[in-house]
Amino acid sequence: MKYQHHSFNNKEVEVQIASFSNGNEVSEYHIILQGTQPTLTYKEQLNNLTDVYNSLLTGELKGASALFKRYFLSDAANQGEMLLAMATEYSDCALSIVEQPPLNGTKIALWVYLQTNVQSRVLPNGLFEAVHGNYRHFWGGSAFNRAANSEYQTRLLLNDYVMQLMEQGCTLADHCIRTWFFVQNVDVNYAGVVKARNEVFVTQNLTEHTHYI
């Protein structure tokens, strides 16, 4: 693993890059982009991060394709619409938005996972597919629903995901590597998430006698 740190002072942005290459045709990158000037407006910070990210794709990371992006916002309710408008225009991978303010007081940070020599596309069911050689990976992000409580929401989310996997000849037990759940007001809502998750897992042969995700 190789680690790099770059400062783009003209854009008030710092970038951390972790790269892995074992000499085969596919290299992997995790990059974190974060503003350094808290006094800039959210729009200015978003534009600066986008400009730096695009410059990386045409420079140091040329040939790499994004498979997953996660934005960390200080105020998702008021900032998400502008971000989604821009992200939809450049939609090239699974996208996740989380309200988790950067520690340095700025309003937005971005984590991106990229690979080289992959072909990616969005599937009709909403998953993103990345293919290299004989391998296929499926990514999803920003799934949510407005069911009455956290239990119902979790059950619907997982059942929808099970169906998405089935359409690709996959199962939750055999092919899902990792899930992320972001829960508002954990003290109140987490119990419902756990209840629904465990109940769905049983139907998918994910038990103490097999394995969990």
Identify the residue ranges that each predicted region occupies.
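Short, polar/acidic, helix-capping and beta-turn segments at strand->helix junctions
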Residues: 1-213
